[in-house]
Amino acid sequence: MKLRSECLPKSEHGTVLYTLSQLPDFPPCKDQDYSHEDLLQTAETFLKSRIKEGDVQANFLLGQLFFEEGWYEDALLQFEKVKDEDNQALYQAGVMYYDGLGTQEDHRKGVKYMERIVTSDCPSAKHLKYAAAYNLGRAYFEGYGIPHSDKEAERWWLFAADNGNPKASLKAQSVLGMYYSSPPNVDLQKAFLWHSEACGNGSLESQGALGVMYLYGNGIKKNVQAAIECLKEAAERGNVYAQGHLVSCYYQRKLYTKAVELAKKIVSHDNIELLVNTTDCLPSYTVKGVAIATFYFARCLHLGLGIKQDSTAAKQLYSKAAQLDAQVAAELNFDIIYGKI
């Protein structure tokens, strides 16, 4: 299970660029055709003038502006300048070192920066502690920058999840659901509990996972109607894993036209990384969702269900599903052999 870093807790005002543009002393727009690039240039000039005046936070804001634009090398340079005075800069630099954004991966340094935040007594670090604790749990789970330990990962994630506190780490709450669903730590009742907490707090990942748990009766009594409701809502919000299982549900209920229509949309995605970044769902589960949809689309083409029969296209899609996720394709092949699909 490849995890992703917890993002910096977001300002309620949105992006740095938008926040800056609303400040009373931000230079006004003189041209009605003010482009995004023009606004960026104005914001950069504005922040650099603040930096010259000794405004430490302006360094962080400039770094965050660069970070949000994907200019990672420039962002890291700004964060490093003020990491000892600004905990948000320290946090972002830690994420960048761990994930290798704008620099070579340095997991140990990333871990060190997160440890500084969770042990800090500074009031400005308080809102970052849950996110930093999630990232430490991730490091222990992956064994990068620190010795692998499932128990330490679990401990940090439980701290970060804070009993389902909506203001705690949403990623920690969701990943605990995944953690308790996977060997050797399987406890499906705990998994259902944590996915429920995370879903209630807005987790798209956990909403899809809950739908699957209801669908198969994992950790909770099987409830197909509740499963479909969860999967539909998650699918509409962009959860590809939920979309794949929704295709499966449509197929099983003989709603072949619906299955084909949804599967076509999913199979047309040719940029998995973009899907992952857009939804912030785990890469492995996003790929599984595409693989499931691809296999069922192949099955419909193979048998002419909800679409004109096309054995050649079906063969290509069966192969594509196996390339995406061999385990998913193998399990669905067994379902064909045993007459389940």
Curated annotation (Swiss-Prot):
Gene3D superfamilies: Tetratricopeptide repeat domain
Coiled coil: none
Domain of life assignment: Eukaryota
Record has Transcription regulation as a keyword: no
Pfam families the record matches: Sel1
Start-end of each Sel1-like repeat: 90-122, 130-165, 170-203, 204-239, 240-271, 291-326
Stored SUPFAM superfamilies: HCP-like
GO CC terms in record: cytoplasm
Predominant place of localization: cytoplasm
Transmembrane region(s): none
Sequence ranges of the TPR repeats: 56-89
Keywords: Cytoplasm, Repeat, TPR repeat
Compartmental location: Cytoplasm
Its job: May act as an adapter that regulates LRP2 function.
PANTHER family for the chain: LRP2-BINDING PROTEIN
Protein name: LRP2-binding protein
Organism: Xenopus laevis
Gene name linked to the record: lrp2bp
